């Protein structure tokens, strides 16, 4: 009976616990398990499958409840923290896409030419909400920067959003990247390092002055693009066809640069420095062009009332023109005067010519050697015959044994020595410049053929260089003449034609007078005035001393009566 009573006590406990467990399951399904309910409705399960679903739940809960009754209260506790965590993360994720860059770049992302490390700002008074803050301008939050009182973070998102909106109202392109249409492919994917896609261009331009736009702090060079019209750099070398830029990207930078500098210095010293004048003319802005055009129009339409100030105004207009030319962003680009003269084909032809000349020199030298050897052989044969004759004479002297008044007979040893000395003297006299040995060498250990070839090649190369220098001088003179032609219109003075002024009518006759011109003239100007019907001419003093004077009357008047005078006579 005890076992039956115990068995009777267990079922109601299990029912109560199953109800609590079902309530907790419903709560879980209500909060986060709605997707499971929708999934069960969409599958259209049968009534038998629906009845089989609660049975495993009861079977699973029974051993857990029978083994440990107290922990049943703690089982529904773990799910609520997960739901709370999900709710807390939702408001943090929403505002991020509303930043200027919807896809923020990671700190260590590598872009074309940009450094791997993220730049850190050092703002102190702007709260990192101005465009000169690099983090704010790039649309990223400050992370590990050295800024003070920073508002460019998640905690101050409302203030940051307000600053972004106000900035966009003032300038819609404020958060646009500096380099438009830049290629995002890596440098390794390109054919050669330094080959630039021409679509990329800097929107604002660089302001380099001393680096030649070939350093990392030049934004155009850093992004691997060429400098454009927007740039305001000086002495730029980051343009298409720049030899310095090509040598920088194609290895052996220091050696190639040194060779180029030495070559340019030599060409400049031999020809001239007009290679710097081959740069395009300076560009003016629209406002400056309008101002310059107005100045020229004002000078061309000068009135006679301002004739006394003609010289000052013309000088002012000339100074304005010069000022406008200097204010424009002038790029002094060095281009060698021999850039379009010397070509690779010419260099190859020169090398072939030098090789041919060296071969001809060796051939002529061998021919000379053979001729010299023949001459030496003929001379040696003549010397042998002379030696035989000398021996015969000596033998005759020995046979005679006659002592002269001033001399006496010599011994045979002395005669032999004297004959050897004569033979050596004759040999040296026969070949003073040419050696008898076929393989003669110079004191430096070089063959005479090599020395002759070197001499001929150097002389030929010198003649070629002289021709190139003459061509460069001709081109330099043409460049200087063209530059003078460009400068002459600015220096020309404006010619002011004299304007005849109409004087008031006196006694029915118009009086005209010509004012003296401010320009250099050789003839004086005279004016005529008519008073009471008589024309009067008066000479104006000339500004320059002249030998001959020719009076020029400005006007001729004819006498005629006016209706006013006729009416008076009738009255």
UniProtKB/Swiss-Prot annotation:
Polar residues bias (residue ranges): 293-319, 373-388, 508-539
Main location: nucleus
Keyword Nucleus in annotation: yes
Listed Basic and acidic residues bias regions: 7-16
Family to which the UniProt record says this protein belongs: Belongs to the lin-54 family.
A cellular-component GO term for this protein: nucleus
Superkingdom in the source lineage: Eukaryota
GO function term, MF aspect, one: DNA-binding transcription factor activity
Name of this chain's protein: Protein tesmin/TSO1-like CXC 6
Expression across tissues: Ubiquitous but expressed mostly in flowers.
Domain CRC: 117-241
Gene name of this polypeptide: TCX6
Keyword check for Ribosomal protein: no
Subcellular compartments: Nucleus
Record remark on domains: The cysteine-rich domain CRC binds zinc in vitro.
Alphabetical UniProt keywords: Developmental protein, Metal-binding, Nucleus, Zinc
Record's function text: Plays a role in development of both male and female reproductive tissues.
Low complexity bias: start-end ranges: 540-557
Pfam family, one: TCR
Region (Disordered): 1-52, 92-119, 293-325, 370-411, 507-571
